[in-house]
């Protein structure tokens, strides 16, 4: 019984010691925040079935909802079962700058369960730079000595020794241990190993993690880190020499099939081509109490899966501008930052939940000198527009009658039916509605008149045939060009003038005293290549085309538009065709007989009058 109590006590004591190596626990939440050059970032790890929500507090304690807002410079990434990230710029809303030059932001954190109930809530004050850690751009943005292009720069998670490579970029990996501050060795003028001396670790403030910033480029790995049993991943390095491989932070063994490969550590490579490569080994993951399958990039909003995954390694090779990588411009340097984190696998039992996974978070940083990038003179040629898709479809057309030849005003619906004298001009316009493509052109095919509102009513009289004035009319229809100066889309209009006429009954040749309606069939044309959308009415081809068909054979495949109303005629006289000779010989004789009868009547009247005059005399 005594041994059992001893074992239980030992486990309870040992567990906090192990967890203390990775994070500081505080009742409520496990969280951490970082101070950057232009802003601060809060990272909160939720418990199972929790979703983290953020609010900010002003100086009076009022709470305000936090959303992705470019005006307040707030950004939030919060998903169930994943770490929640809240980023705020130093010039963002409710960020206060104190007299000591530090920025303060009060954040209210609450964990919400799936049923909507708030499980835990806590206030956190973010202070940047941190009181016990002064962050300056010069502390990690020191430019390299002799820039050389096209060399990837790497850094390992556990640098035992290292030296600075010549190149235009820096890399940094930040491990999250409790306030372990490395003391850099004095700079050396000659290339060689530079080993950071690490003082004895001491615990910091509960509820936050302090950063151990390890700035080095091209870390040489110890031989024990290069003992990779299987599943070697070739290192991305230019050249195949041992020196180039080691400068890239990789292992070299000329006895192997791939002599340059990644070691048992975390390797970061930053490339001037716009990519970074992050490689983590299974041995490193197990050392930190995490599973390699649970490692991912923290800032990726929709997930950014590894480009390669084996039983021994996981590889991320992604563009610098993707996967949630943050970019900052500090002076003449570009800083790209992201984090490699691991999810906690929780096992739920009938009476509680446990986990055997540690908490792992690694801050990665790529730094480039912007002045080292060469300018590019580019000429941008706009691609050819795609060929138009031609197919049948509805068109909105309108036929209207103008009040005069200027086509500046038009009759309204209440003005119909119009009354016109024979041979008086009628000004007709057809236009395309609800189209703004200047390349479209309205094409008239057939225009005709009928005595009713039906376009198929008989009799009919053609006005335009195949887009040209009907040649069988002695009063030829006159086409009127659209005014390009006043019309925004002049090709959407067609205008013509006709002389007023009345339709005759086909059998009696009597004038129809009803009204006349006008119709036109039309389509929209879009020129392709050397083709045009104009109609030529003076060529032999056009005359042949016009005489080869009739409007009744084409109107069913086209859109038909009609006039808003009819044109009527008052007291239309009975007309005879000019070529008719019916009863032409008898009509003069009838007139002579009528004149003779009238003369006889008048003569009789005169004789009677004279007789009465003589009698009185």
From Swiss-Prot:
Single Gene Ontology MF annotation: structural constituent of egg coat
Record PTM text: Proteolytically cleaved before the transmembrane segment to yield the secreted ectodomain incorporated in the zona pellucida. O-glycosylated.
Extracellular compartment residues: 21-588
Domain P-type: 224-264
Tissue-level expression: Expressed in oocytes.
Domain (ZP) ranges: 269-540
Subcellular location: Cell membrane
GO biological process: binding of sperm to zona pellucida; prevention of polyspermy
Entries under SUPFAM superfamilies matching the protein: Trefoil
Regions of compositional bias (Pro residues) in chain numbering: 181-196
Cellular component annotations (GO), alphabetically ordered: collagen-containing extracellular matrix; egg coat; extracellular region; plasma membrane
Quaternary structure and partners: Polymers of ZP2 and ZP3 organized into long filaments cross-linked by ZP1 homodimers. Interacts with ZP3.
Function: Component of the zona pellucida, an extracellular matrix surrounding oocytes which mediates sperm binding, induction of the acrosome reaction and prevents post-fertilization polyspermy. The zona pellucida is composed of 3 to 4 glycoproteins, ZP1, ZP2, ZP3, and ZP4. ZP1 ensures the structural integrity of the zona pellucida.
Protein known as: Zona pellucida sperm-binding protein 1
Primary gene name: Zp1
């Amino acid at each position: 019984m005594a041994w059992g109590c001893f074992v239980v006590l030992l486990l309870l004591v040992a567990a906090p010691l192990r967890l203390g190596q990775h994070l500081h626990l505080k009742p409520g939440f496990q969280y951490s925040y970082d101070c950057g050059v232009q802003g601060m970032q809060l990272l909160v790890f939720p418990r199972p079935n929790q979703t983290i929500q953020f609010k900010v507090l002003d100086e009076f304690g009022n709470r305000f909802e936090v959303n992705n807002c470019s005006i307040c410079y707030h950004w939030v990434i919060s998903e169930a079962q994943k770490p929640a990230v809240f980023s705020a710029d130093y010039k963002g809303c409710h960020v206060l700058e104190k007299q000591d030059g530090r920025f303060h932001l009060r954040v209210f954190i609450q964990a919400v369960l799936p049923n909507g109930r708030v499980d835990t809530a806590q206030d956190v004050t973010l202070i940047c730079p941190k009181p016990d850690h002064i962050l300056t751009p010069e502390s990690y943005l020191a430019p390299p000595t002799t820039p050389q292009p096209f060399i990837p720069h790497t850094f390992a998670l556990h640098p035992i020794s290292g030296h600075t490579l010549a190149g235009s970029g820096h890399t940094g990996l930040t491990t999250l241990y409790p306030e372990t501050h490395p003391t850099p060795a004095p700079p050396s003028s000659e290339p060689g190993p530079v080993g950071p001396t690490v003082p004895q670790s001491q615990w910091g403030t509960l509820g936050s993690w302090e950063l151990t910033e390890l700035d080095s480029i091209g870390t040489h790995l110890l031989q024990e880190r290069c003992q990779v049993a299987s599943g070697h991943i070739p290192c991305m390095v230019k050249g195949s020499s041992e020196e180039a491989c080691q400068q890239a932070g990789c292992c070299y063994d000329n006895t192997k099939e791939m002599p340059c490969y990644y070691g048992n550590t975390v390797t970061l490579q930053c490339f001037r081509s716009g990519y970074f490569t992050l490689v983590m080994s299974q041995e490193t993951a197990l050392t930190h109490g995490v599973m390699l399958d649970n490692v991912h990039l923290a800032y990726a909003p929709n997930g950014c899966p590894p480009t390669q995954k084996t039983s021994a390694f996981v590889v991320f090779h992604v563009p610098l501008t993707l996967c949630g990588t943050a970019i900052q411009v500090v002076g003449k340097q570009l800083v790209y930052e992201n984090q490699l984190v691991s999810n906690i696998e929780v096992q739920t039992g009938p009476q509680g939940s446990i986990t055997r996974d540690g908490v792992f978070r690694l801050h990665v940083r790529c730094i480039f000198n912007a002045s080292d990038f060469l300018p590019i003179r580019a000429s941008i040629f706009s691609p050819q527009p795609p060929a138009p898709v031609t197919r049948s479809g509805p068109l909105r057309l309108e036929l209207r009658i103008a009040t005069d030849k200027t086509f500046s005003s038009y009759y309204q619906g209440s003005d119909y039916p119009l009354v016109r004298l024979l041979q008086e001009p009628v000004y007709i316009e057809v236009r395309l509605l609800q189209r703004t493509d200047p390349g479209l052109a309205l094409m008239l095919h057939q225009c005709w008149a009928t005595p009713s509102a039906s376009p198929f009513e008989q009799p009919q009289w053609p006005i335009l045939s195949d887009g040209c004035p009907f040649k069988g009319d002695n009063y030829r229809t006159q086409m009127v060009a659209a005014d390009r100066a006043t019309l925004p889309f002049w090709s959407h209009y067609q205008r013509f003038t006709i002389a007023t006429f009345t339709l005759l009954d086909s059998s009696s040749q009597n004038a129809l005293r009803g009204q006349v309606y006008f119709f036109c069939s039309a389509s929209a044309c879009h020129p392709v290549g050397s083709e045009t959308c104009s109609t030529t009415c003076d060529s032999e081809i056009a005359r042949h085309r016009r005489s080869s068909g009739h409007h009744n054979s084409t109107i069913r495949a086209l859109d038909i538009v009609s006039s808003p109303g009819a044109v009527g005629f008052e007291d239309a006289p009975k007309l005879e065709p000019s070529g008719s000779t019916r009863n032409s010989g008898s009509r003069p004789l009838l007139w002579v007989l009528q004149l003779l009868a009238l003369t006889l009547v008048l003569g009789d009247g005169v004789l009677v009058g004279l007789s009465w005059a003589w009698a009185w005399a």
